[in-house]
């Protein structure tokens, strides 16, 4: 399973178009694979300028279970440091992450 995760992520990184990236991201959440160790990877793509890429990555992140509090805290810090001001996607992502923190 881990090899398949890495293969999918490599394909996303190497995709030539945003449309291809979005399709591959949708495969990640539709596959039911466990991407818990790769949460930050999808957080980064959830901040992408392309709406569809961002939405698909957000969906993957949203469907990851068993996240550690450290991962969630790291994600919020990353979003704060790397999102454009007033980014709706960033605010929605932070709201989701905060809801997962116990």
Report residues per predicted region.
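Short inter-helical turns and helix N-cap capping residues of alpha-solenoid HEAT/ARM repeat scaffolds
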Residues: 16-17, 49-50, 86-87
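Preference for long, well-ordered alpha-helical segments
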Residues: 74-95
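Amphipathic alpha-helical scaffolding segments comprising HEAT/armadillo-like alpha-solenoid repeats
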Residues: 1-12, 33-47, 69-79
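Structural detector for internal amphipathic alpha-helices that build alpha-solenoid repeat scaffolds
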Residues: 1, 10, 21-33, 54-67, ...
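Ankyrin-repeat and related helical/solenoid repeat scaffolds used for protein-protein interactions
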Residues: 39-63
